[in-house]
């Protein structure tokens, strides 16, 4: 029955405690460290959650401390806990170990005496009212440090709760050596003690009953006290009765499970299974279960001291303040701990400083290298993205597809990277320029494999004709003729496409013919060989290639000379291929005045005979050494072709032959006759390039068997001259 009663009362008290603490925890203790709160008086420290003063100085009324009104308002000696009406001896916070999971407050408790007064009829006397720590929200409980003590001969002490449940001890009057007064133990002789039950009561009273020992008369005293404050070698009850009180130890705690209270503290939540928390945490709170009471208490971690129940209340302990903490070594205080560092001599100190400087410089160096590497990476990434964008826009994917589907073409051409060509041309430096034309700029440079190439960078690109442009690249990459400049590859990763050709060292034919060179190499034999080579190359393009190709811009500036003055046709910027069943192309007029076919100029229909006409103008240049357009003839309204045909008509062709080749007039006149046929106004009356090539080969190989008599074609030539003059005059 006793156990059931305790259990029921304990459960009710615990529930009330949780309810009260839950309500008080709703508001974090934000202002408890206010300067208006007095934290000491009477030499006693009053840490939060206890407090004196306004309501913000303590957690709730259970922790309120006031001064005893009986002392005329003085708060120096008698601080009281108002809710239990007890004078405070001292207050301590929970210690940082699992064996002290609660705080402690020592109070003054009553002393019950019997027979100590001159007026024996007074019976039992109590110096103070019985202790009662019950009530809604009470955080207090009796700790197991307390004992029920009875002092005096034959004293029978009884401890009762509100319902008079009895627990006690009885002292003896037998004087034996084992029970000598001086043995400092309260073990039965004139003094006995009893432990409190596991289920400690919240309200207690102490009574004294007499036993049958005749020697038990006299002064008797009984009280509840903390054994820390009990002088066990004193067995005179008068002493305790005169003192008027005994020190009782109360444990206290409050529930911080509500995160609204715990989180503002900044404490770490722990359980018994927590590991090495004390090495790193400043403030800790833990949940526990003690004497059927659930609690949560907070404390400062290892290396810290102070009050964990206020934010920032745990302060680092400076262990180095202890003398000789590290012996001869240097003590260095750290957060929550300390370290002993061997003393550094001057050389070692200098080395240490130098080491620190070196580490700093290395760190700075690595930082700079890292930033530079990141910059290079971002720049490279942007360049790759930009190159891929241009590659797709310039038809790179289509070119790759076509190169891989055509037999052998992959080996005959190459797709260069923009990085490779930028490096080869010093980022397209002006110092590397070979020449500039209407289609773009040509640069000379050596590739990584040591080969010298000509890099042509286009000026503009027509995106609508990109597919046609890619088809032409594929086609030109398959041309393999000794008198045609070889297209080595291209680069499509730039804003405008770049073409890479084989490098031809001796420049173009135009400069060799018309600039003031002391060039003894431009003999008639060389000129005739150049004509034969160009005619053969054009014949190959018109008939022998996979698809007929019309150059559309045959002129002496597009005829290059290698180191042995062998001719090579270049600049296919306006070239077009046609299907084998096509006879002409209808395009916008493109070409160079002075070389342009008048029939193409009027009809916009370009045929292979248009290339024949342009080649005829080149033959006239080789014969006369004249430019296709000159200031004198321009004022007269005629070009080189008209000028030549007039001279042929008037039988004065010899007069316009270049003075440097007049000694070869017979061969020259044979070529002049062929040139006149190439310049026929009607394209269908012109020879094709195969016929022209065969005729030139015959002239070159059989110079003695030439028939150079001019045929009577005056009427037809009259028509030609009139038509040509009309075109150029317009």
Curated annotation (Swiss-Prot):
Highest taxon of the lineage: Eukaryota
Extracellular topology ranges: 26-357
Record's protein name: Wall-associated receptor kinase-like 3
Cytoplasmic side: 379-730
Acidic residues compositional bias, start-end: 712-721
Residues covered by region (Disordered): 703-730
Domain Protein kinase: 428-699
Compartment(s) of residence: Membrane
Gene Ontology biological process: cell surface receptor signaling pathway; defense response
Residues binding ATP: 434-442, 456
GO molecular function: ATP binding; calcium ion binding; protein serine kinase activity; protein serine/threonine kinase activity
Tissue note: Preferentially expressed in roots and flowers.
Entries under Pfam families matching the protein: Pkinase, WAK
Membrane topology: Single-pass type I membrane protein
Annotated organism of origin: Arabidopsis thaliana
Glycosylation positions in this chain: 32, 38, 68, 90, 119, 132, 212, 233, 269
InterPro entries (UniProt xref): EGF_Ca-bd_CS (IPR018097), Kinase-like_dom_sf (IPR011009), Prot_kinase_dom (IPR000719), Ser/Thr_kinase_AS (IPR008271), WAK (IPR013695), WAK-like (IPR045274)
UniProtKB keywords: ATP-binding, Disulfide bond, Glycoprotein, Kinase, Membrane, Nucleotide-binding, Serine/threonine-protein kinase, Signal, Transferase, Transmembrane, Transmembrane helix
Protein family: Belongs to the protein kinase superfamily. Ser/Thr protein kinase family.
SUPFAM superfamilies: Protein kinase-like (PK-like)
Signal peptide: 1-25
Segments for region (Atypical EGF-like): 283-340
Catalytic activity entry: L-seryl-[protein] + ATP = O-phospho-L-seryl-[protein] + ADP + H(+); L-threonyl-[protein] + ATP = O-phospho-L-threonyl-[protein] + ADP + H(+)
Ranges annotated as spanning the membrane: 358-378
């Amino acid at each position: 029955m006793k156990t059931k009663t305790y259990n029921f009362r304990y459960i009710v008290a615990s529930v009330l405690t949780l309810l009260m603490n839950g309500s008080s925890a709703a508001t974090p203790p934000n202002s408890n460290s206010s300067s208006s709160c007095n934290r000491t008086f009477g030499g006693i420290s009053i840490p939060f959650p206890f407090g004196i003063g306004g309501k913000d100085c303590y957690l709730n009324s259970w922790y309120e401390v006031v001064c005893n009104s009986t002392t005329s308002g003085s708060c120096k000696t008698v601080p009281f806990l108002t809710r239990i009406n007890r004078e405070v001896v001292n207050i301590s916070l929970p210690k940082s170990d699992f064996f002290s999971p609660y705080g402690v407050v020592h109070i003054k408790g009553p002393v019950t005496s019997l027979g100590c007064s001159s007026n024996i009829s007074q019976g039992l006397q109590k110096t103070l009212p019985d202790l009662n720590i019950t009530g809604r929200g009470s955080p207090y409980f009796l700790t197991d440090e307390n004992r029920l003590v009875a002092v005096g001969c034959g004293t029978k002490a009884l401890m009762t709760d509100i319902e008079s449940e009895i627990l006690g001890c009885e002292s003896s009057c037998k004087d034996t050596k084992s029970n000598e007064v001086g043995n400092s133990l309260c073990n039965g002789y004139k003094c006995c003690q009893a432990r409190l039950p596991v289920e400690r009561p919240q309200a207690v009273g102490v009574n004294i009953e007499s036993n049958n020992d005749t020697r038990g008369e006299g002064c008797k005293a009984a009280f509840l006290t903390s054994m820390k404050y009990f002088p066990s070698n004193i067995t005179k009850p008068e002493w305790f009765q005169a003192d008027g009180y005994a020190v009782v130890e109360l444990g206290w705690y409050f529930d911080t499970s509500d995160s609204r209270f715990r989180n503002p503290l900044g404490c770490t939540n722990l359980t018994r299974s927590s590991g090495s928390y004390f090495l790193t945490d400043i403030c800790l709170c833990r949940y526990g279960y003690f004497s059927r009471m659930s609690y949560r208490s907070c404390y400062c971690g290892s290396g810290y001291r102070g009050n964990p129940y206020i934010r920032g209340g745990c302060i680092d302990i400076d262990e180095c303040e202890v003398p000789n903490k590290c012996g001869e070594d240097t003590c260095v205080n750290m957060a929550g701990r300390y370290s002993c560092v061997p003393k550094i001599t001057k050389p070692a100190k200098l080395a240490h400083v130098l080491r620190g400087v070196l580490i700093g410089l290395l760190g700075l160096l690595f930082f700079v290298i890292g930033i530079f590497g990141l910059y290079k990476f971002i720049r490279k990434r942007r360049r790759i993205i930009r190159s891929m964008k241009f590659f797709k826009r310039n038809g790179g994917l289509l070119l790759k597809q076509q190169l891989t589907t055509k037999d052998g073409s992959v080996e005959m051409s190459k797709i260069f990277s923009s990085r490779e060509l930028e490096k080869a041309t010093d980022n397209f430096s002006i110092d590397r320029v070979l020449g500039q034309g209407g289609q773009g700029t040509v640069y000379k440079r050596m590739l990584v494999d040591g080969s010298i190439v000509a890099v042509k960078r286009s000026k503009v690109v027509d995106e609508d004709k990109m597919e046609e442009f890619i088809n032409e690249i594929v086609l030109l990459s398959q041309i393999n003729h000794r008198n045609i400049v070889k297209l080595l590859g291209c680069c499509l990763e730039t804003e405008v496409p770049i073409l890479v050709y084989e490098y031809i060292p001796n420049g173009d034919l135009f400069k060799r013919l018309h600039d003031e060179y002391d060039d003894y190499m431009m003999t008639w034999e060389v000129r005739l060989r150049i004509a034969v080579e160009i005619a053969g190359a054009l014949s190959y393009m018109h008939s022998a290639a996979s698809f007929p190709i019309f150059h559309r811009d045959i002129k002496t500036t597009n005829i290059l000379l290698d180191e042995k003055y062998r001719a090579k046709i270049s600049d296919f910027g306006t070239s077009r291929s046609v299907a084998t069943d096509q006879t002409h192309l209808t395009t916008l007029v493109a070409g160079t005045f002075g070389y342009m076919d008048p029939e193409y100029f009027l009809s916009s229909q370009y045929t292979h005979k248009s290339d024949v006409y342009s080649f005829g103008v080149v033959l006239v240049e080789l014969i006369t050494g004249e430019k296709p357009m000159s200031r004198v003839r321009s004022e007269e309204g005629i070009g080189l072709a008209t000028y030549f045909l007039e001279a042929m008509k008037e039988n004065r062709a010899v007069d316009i032959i270049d003075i440097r080749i007049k000694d070869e007039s017979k061969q020259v006149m044979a070529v002049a006759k062929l040139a006149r046929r190439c310049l026929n106004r009607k394209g269908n009356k012109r020879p094709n390039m195969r016929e022209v090539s065969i005729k030139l080969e015959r002239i070159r190989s059989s110079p003695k068997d030439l028939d150079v008599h001019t045929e009577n074609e005056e009427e037809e030539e009259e028509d030609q001259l009139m038509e040509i003059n009309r075109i150029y005059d317009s």
